[in-house]
Amino acid sequence: DLMPPIFKYASLSEILQDYVYQHNQPGQTELELLLEPEDNFDNLSQKVSLEIYRIVQEAVGNSLKHAQATLVKIILVREDNKVKLTVSDNGRGFEQQAGKTGIGLTIIKERVENLRGTLTLNSAPGKGTELIVEIDLENLEK
């Protein structure tokens, strides 16, 4: 993965805020971003920041393309060395069948594995989709 130049000049918080601004579709699909605490992502490594950004891009892209959602929420929380990313939508959801995932989800799984994190996916028809990524930054330093 080539590091996009923006990561040299902006923090993950700023990049995500810009992404939401660029992809928000008022009247169609609203994007909401919550950073908790907002200034606590600036010292993440570029690698971690990029992987989180790419996961957000893929997850939001899936919601915009497939879910027919009117709301997509992106929540990024950091407590000490733990980072939790949740991307959820109020779209149509899907049946979770063992072993069946689309290419987008496969890409997300690979990125989560790169971060030695865990991925939880909750979805059901008519119930929307929730994707949760949990990363322990201490695992990345070993």
Question: Model regions: which residues?
Answer:
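Coiled-coil dimerization/phosphotransfer module
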Residues: 1-142
